[in-house]
Amino acid sequence: MEETQDSSSSKPKNTDENFSLWIEQYFNHKCCITFLTGCYSCQWQYREWEKTELGSCCCSRKEQFFYMCLVIAFILSVLFLFVWVETSNEYNGFDWVVYLGTGCWFFWSILVLSAAGIMVAYTTLLLLLGFLLLWERIELNLHTSHKVFICLVIVLCSFLLAVLSHFWKDKWLIAGLSLQIFAPFVHLSLITVMIIISWPLSICVARLESEVKVRRYRMADYEQEIQERCNVFQRLRALQIAAGLSFLIILLCLYLMPLGIYSPCILKKENLGPKPTLFGHRGAPMLAPENTMMSFEKAVELDVSGLETDIYLSFDSVPFLMHDYDLTRTTNIKEVLPSAAGNHTSNFNWTFLSTLNAGKWFLKHKPFFGMKPLSEADKRRAGNQSIPQLSELLALAKREQKIVIFDLFGPRPGHPLRNTFVRRVVKVILDSKIEQRLIFWLPGFDRDYVRFMAPGFQHVGRLWSIKDLTKHNITIINVDYKRLFYAGLRDYKEAKIYIHVYVINEPWLFSLAWCSSINSVTTDNIELLNQLSRPLFFMTPGFYMFMWLFLDIASAVIIGFVFCYNWIKEIKRERWLEAAASSGLLHSETITDITENNDASQQKPEVAPTSANLAPENMIELQKTEPKTENL
């Protein structure tokens, strides 16, 4: 019985021992080095790597060149990812443009975003692996496949950035706007990053200083190499100054960064204007097929202030709601009349247009990424939608007292209403008996006639000068948000111009509009923007000042402590060196023992010790063994 108990009690011990052995076997320094070299150089066989000396080149010229290429690839990929993430408000428009060129609806914007994220992750991982290998003082040897992929990343990112600069210059404007609102938080985050970086940097700077002093001891025994070693000292000092001074300059720039920051969302609470009212862009296109009565009714249910749409006139003079110049994307014309699918929207009679289905496409191809799933009732309702007339929208707006704003597209040459389409639309509006104040009249053609026939319409201008707006007696502007913030927003506010911007879907952009005292916005994302009770990233000047000074002082104290701690640690190593030198411990046999105890690279006995080899724990072992040698 006792033997049985002993054997049963020994099982957990054996299990623990086996687990410890397993941990030691697979999670040790050798395995770590093998993993790093395997990922970076595809060399998965462990061997004793020859370590480079501090102050010497870490790799060949060729490897230095490709490491610089890696840094360039990282910068380009991060830049492209930043621009693309910040332009998420424009993803639907990008997908629509690609659809016009390819005829295939797909979330191309998300595909590009995924590719950018993969490139950033890939280059970041390679940079991290290279840094860890340099930290271990192992010579870099990037695998050929990585070199090819790095070149592809540089070419692809350069091409995509060039395309953005040529075809979508306004995307850079969005990136600039994002910096306005995110700059205070980027500043605070970067200071935190600098605190993290200070730890390895302080170790590096202190180790370089210690390395210089260690090599000075070596010069006493190798006087013939003094000239050569002086060059090494210069390189070590240069590395030390370059690393420390660069860090200090960047840190000081970050400390002073708030002096150059302008963010509309840093203002006093009493200066924050009311929340901008929302206009449904073609209704509520995230909840129902765009420009259908279901879409506008959904927008009304969400309590929007206005409804935005697009108007064409059929060949038999009926104004109807449609955005595209053809019917292929939002109707089933390819099934009903494939031969005429590419014809212009205004070339059809209303008798034919009224028979088309305008909702099935919405169920097949979601227009927005991340849309909520529809209920079964909404699916059935959406699948039965048709193209609505303008009169139907006006009846809804009249009943619910909602503002109506629209883009009016003129007919093509040969259309019966080629020159009188504005008058036809005005007649339809007046016949609906809707209050004229609820019409935001945007079209600029035949405006004098409109003023005469409907003096109650609220005329809306574009991004005109204050002088032109005053000349035409216009107090409302409808502008692209990307252009407005760079075109003298303050001047329009001082002139008491009502500002309406389009199309804003992202909360951070809506917060920017709110902090800038914009009156109303057109949006696809009504539900999300309705939930905002205050602007995102809003801060009072006093709170930001407190955070700025507090983080600056705290970071300076922490960074100073980190540098002092690692510096003192290296000073202790130097004292052990002096004690060892004065007691005669530093001869060739002792140096060899130190090297072996620290798993250093295999060196000849004549090679001098480095700061890493002269750790206090090694010197303790030496003190135990060395006196015997001296007595002999």
UniProtKB/Swiss-Prot annotation:
Cytoplasmic compartment residues: 1-64, 136-147, 202-240, 564-632
A GO molecular-function descriptor: metal ion binding
Location of region: Disordered: 596-632
Protein family according to the UniProt entry: Belongs to the glycerophosphoryl diester phosphodiesterase family.
Top-level lineage group: Eukaryota
Chain sites annotated for binding a divalent metal cation: E308, D310, H323
GO CC annotations on file: cytoplasm; membrane
PROSITE patterns per UniProt: GP_PDE
UniProt subcellular location: Cytoplasm; Membrane
Extracellular side: 86-114, 169-180, 262-542
Keyword entries, A-Z: Cytoplasm, Glycoprotein, Hydrolase, Membrane, Metal-binding, Transmembrane, Transmembrane helix
Basic and acidic residues composition bias: residue spans: 623-632
Pfam families: GDPD (PF03009)
Transmembrane regions: 65-85, 115-135, 148-168, 181-201, 241-261, 543-563
GO biological process, one term: lipid metabolic process
Domain GP-PDE residues, every copy: 276-533
InterPro entries registered for this protein in UniProt: GP_PDE_dom (IPR030395), PLC-like_Pdiesterase_TIM-brl (IPR017946)
Documented EC number(s): 3.1.-.-
Residues carrying covalently attached carbohydrate according to the record: N343, N349, N384, N473
Bilayer topology: Multi-pass membrane protein
Tissue: Detected in testis, in particular in spermatocytes.
Designated name of the protein: Glycerophosphodiester phosphodiesterase domain-containing protein 4
Species the sequence originates in: Mus musculus
